[in-house]
Amino acid sequence: MGKIFFLGLLSICIFLVFFFYKQKVNNVIYNKIVEKFEDNVFIDETYTYLFKDSNLKELVFIKSQLIVPEFENKNMMKATGYLADAYRALSTVYKFDFKVHDNKILGFKSVIFEGFEDARVSKHENNLPGEKWQQLKDFNIGDPNVNEKFFHLEFPFVVKNTLCVTISKRFFKKIKKLKRLKIVLISNEDREYKIDIENFLPKYNL
């Protein structure tokens, strides 16, 4: 009887340790996908921060890598031209996805990273590959009016809006040095969605 009681108590303790560890880790949910096609490799790593009690539901940081062995040699990496430039631009991509729930389709006309108010922002489509995309400044928020004809509509269900912000490698290095991520999203209706969280990016090998 005593042995059974001890084993039961041990099981409860193990469950509690797992539960609290899981909760702590779940502040940022990590996911990694590796896809191979022929000799090429595509790696997609996502870091998801969940918000509570807000229309802003998730901040997702995404690092995507494309590895093409024939392009990895030194001569190719120093080459010029569309193909070489495109590969250098696409080999590692950093972006934030902001997920906002509403009963309307939203557009976002501005994104402000506190501390970098003078950052150079572009507003073109995030189509890949493309000459405009390769000329990425500090970050790109896409065309805020791409769904303008739907802005006036209200729906009887939740609309899951996603704002994709692609950031340059140079700008990513600057963001990684911050202690906190303070970001403001401004919608087409001038509504502000404010983020102020601990910067989790330095904790990972990015």
Swiss-Prot record:
Where is it localised?
Cell outer membrane
Naming one, the record's GO cellular component terms include:
cell outer membrane
Kindly give the Pfam families that the UniProt entry links to this protein. Answer: BPTA
Q: Which InterPro entries match?
A: BptA
**Coiled coil located at which positions?**
none
Q: Which domain of life is it from?
A: Bacteria
**Is Signal tagged as a keyword?**
yes
Question: Which keywords annotate this record?
Answer: Cell outer membrane, Membrane, Signal, Virulence
UniProt key word Signal: yes
Span of the signal peptide:
1-19
Q: Which NCBIfam families match?
A: VirAssocBptA (NF045772)
Q: Which family does it belong to?
A: Belongs to the BptA family.
Q: What does this protein do?
A: Virulence-associated protein essential for survival of the bacterium within the tick host and therefore within the natural life cycle of the spirochete.
Instruction: Please report the name of this protein according to its UniProt entry.
Output: Protein BptA
Q: Which organism is it from?
A: Borrelia andersonii (Borreliella andersonii)
